[in-house]
Amino acid sequence: MMRKLFNALSQLHRGVLICGGFAAFMLFGALLLMLPISQTGTKEVSFLDALFMSVSIVSVTGMSMFDLKTDFTIFGQLVVLFLMQVGGLGIMTMMAMVGISRGRKIRLQERLLIRDSFNLQTPSGMVMLVRKIILMTLSIEFCAGTILAAYFFTQNGWIGIYQGYWHAVSAFTNCGMDIMGNDVGFAGMAANPLVSTVVCISMLLGGVGFIALDDLLKHHRWSALTLNSKFILVMEMILIPLGVIVYFLLEGNNPATLGHLSTAEKWQSAFFMSISSRMAGFTLFDIHAMNNATGLIIMLFMFIGAAPVSTAGGIRTTTIGLLLLSLWSWIRGRKDVVIFHKRVDPECLVKASNVFTLATVLTFLTAMMVFLLEPASHFDFEDALFEAVSAFSTVGFSMGLTTEWNIPCKIVIMVAMFIGRIGVMTLAVTFAGRPKSQIKYPKENIIIG
């Protein structure tokens, strides 16, 4: 029976298996959150709300209509911790880890699944990659958790140790949820330079990606790094300061956000929000209180996201970087895109263009559906677009509309978060048919522009 089931599953497209694996685990998470032992009983949790929570957590988005501190028990919070840990690492990575720990040989089909889940080119070295990912994850979370636990212990006693490690996982997986309660939130924690720095580093390490981290650990010299790692690091060096400047200039005089802080605290908070806006979605203030100009720019940051093979989402920093360099090369009349004296494969540029186009279309479709499906909508299209970008990019920022959506809107946002987690490349490959012929037709140009 099991052999027949395995043979049937092996015939499915690997993209279908990846999507199915995430969907099944999200459903499993919803059932765990529905258990009476998971809830405090302060607020009714319907199955749809539990499923929304599970999808949000496993996709490491972090959108929630509940207060994890008051609405869920310690067991429920541990369920959330488990879901975001698996969601951050990926279903296929966790399954491979279980197989490796039991001494079982990882089959070629499983190696291909891991490769496809990370959008890598070759299945070679997948077992070693999984081991490194697990080791890096546990090491970073343990170090960050120990520092946070020591701080929270001085503030909250023994429960502070639990809070420290819980938030370390939330930061590294870029889920961006907290268990401090809506009355305190993360704003109170991030006001402390120690907590802010540790959480920022955790978010950044999770957002840089496992491939780049492994490359940095193996090679300590810039010249020895791969082109991929160099490009990822350069994009971070550009985007982080850019985000800091945006927040400081546009929100520095806004009393509802950063205006009430000292100059040093403004810079610190701007740095924190610059990283969080593309990765975890931790927030230090009410997002709805931001200036309109800031909201538009933050939507762009969320859409860009973090690096490939990371715990964060978005279209990826490499995608937007390649598109901008391709545009610059075209303006200068150059056929090839050259980065650090290396010519980029044209196939990479095609993939980047396709990812950007598909992601843009899906995001706007999501925003339109949310806006149209809410009959008594008291928000404008810009708010709907902000929520759609946040869901698709798995950042989790919200204009405060999460608790007010009707059932169709919740389903639309869940689909957006799901697609954002598996990635548009996986989605496209899953539904794309196999090429049926290699016939080359005559070439002719079409007028553009």
Sequence positions of predicted segments:
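Membrane-proximal intracellular helices of multi-pass ion channels
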Residues: 1-449
